[in-house]
C-alpha cells in the first residue's frame, strides 16, 4: 500500500496541470490567510477603540441615579480570536455588537452583511471559502482523473494481478489526496501561527 501511495504521488508530480493548480491554490491560500489576519487585527483594534470610547463616555457621564444610568446603556462586543482570520463563522451575518440597556432586549446589530453589496453576502474571500468549496472540488476532479487514468492505461488490472486488493488501492489513492489537503491546511495553519505568534503567547 505504501508503494501505491508513493507511485500515486510520483504520478501526480508528473502531471503539469496538478503542479500548476497546487501552486495556484497554495499562493491563493497564502494571500487569503494573510489578508484574513490583517482584517482580523483591524477588527480587534476597532473593538478595543470602541470599548475605550464607550468606557470614557460612561466615566464622563453626569451624576445620576442608577435607573437613569441603566437607561443610558452600553455596548458589548463579541470577542474575536485568531481563528477568525480563517473563518468568521456567522459573525458577518449576525453582527458582533450588542446594545445593553434596561427594559429592552436588543439583538446583535451592525452586521457587515446588512451593509454590504448583494454579491458579497455569499461570503468573503477567506481561507475557509477555499477549504469548504474550491479545494474539495479540485480534489474530486483529481480523484476522478486518477481513477479514469488507471482504467484507461490498464494499470488497475495489473495492480490487482500483482496481489493488491481493490480496497488497498482505493485507500492508498484516497490517502494520497487527503495528504494533499492536509499539506494545504498545514500551510494555512503555519501562516496563521507565524503572523499571530505574539498573540498566541
Question: Can you describe what each PLM-predicted range is?
Answer:
Residues 1-25:
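Aromatic- and glycine-rich beta-strand/loop motifs that create alpha-glucan
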Residues 3, 144-179:
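Helix-loop-helix units of permease transmembrane domains in multi-pass membrane transporters
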Residues 24-26, 31, 45, 49:
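N-terminal low-complexity, Ser/Thr- and acidic-residue-enriched intrinsically disordered segments
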Residues 29-36, 58-59, 96-138, 172-201:
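Secretory targeting signals
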Residues 38-42, 46, 150, 194-199:
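Membrane-interface elements of multi-pass transporters and channels
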Residues 40-106:
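Membrane-proximal extracellular/periplasmic loop immediately following the first transmembrane helix
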Residues 66-82, 116-129, 155-164, 189-193:
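Hydrophobic alpha-helical transmembrane segments
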Residues 75-89, 123-149, 153:
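Long, hydrophobic alpha-helical segments
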Amino acid at each position: 500500500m505504501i508503494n501505491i501511495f508513493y507511485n500515486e504521488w510520483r504520478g501526480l508530480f508528473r502531471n503539469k496541470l496538478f503542479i500548476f493548480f497546487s501552486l495556484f491554490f497554495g499562493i491563493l491560500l497564502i494571500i487569503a490567510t494573510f489578508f484574513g489576519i490583517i482584517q482580523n487585527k483591524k477588527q480587534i483594534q476597532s473593538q478595543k477603540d470602541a470599548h475605550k470610547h464607550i468606557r470614557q463616555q460612561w466615566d464622563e457621564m453626569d451624576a445620576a441615579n442608577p435607573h437613569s444610568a441603566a437607561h443610558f446603556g452600553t455596548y458589548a462586543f463579541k470577542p474575536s480570536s485568531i481563528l477568525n482570520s480563517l473563518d468568521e463563522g456567522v459573525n458577518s451575518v449576525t453582527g458582533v455588537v450588542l446594545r445593553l440597556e434596561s427594559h429592552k432586549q436588543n439583538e446583535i446589530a451592525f452586521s457587515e452583511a446588512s451593509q454590504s453589496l448583494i454579491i458579497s453576502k455569499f461570503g468573503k474571500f477567506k481561507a475557509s471559502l477555499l477549504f469548504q468549496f474550491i479545494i474539495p472540488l479540485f480534489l474530486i476532479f483529481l480523484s476522478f482523473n486518477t481513477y479514469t487514468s488507471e482504467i484507461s492505461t490498464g494499470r488497475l488490472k495489473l495492480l490487482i494481478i500483482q496481489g493488491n486488493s481493490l480496497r488497498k488501492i482505493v485507500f492508498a489513492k484516497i490517502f494520497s489526496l487527503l495528504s494533499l489537503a492536509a499539506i494545504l491546511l498545514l500551510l494555512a495553519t503555519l501562516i496563521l501561527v507565524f503572523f499571530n505568534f505574539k498573540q498566541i503567547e
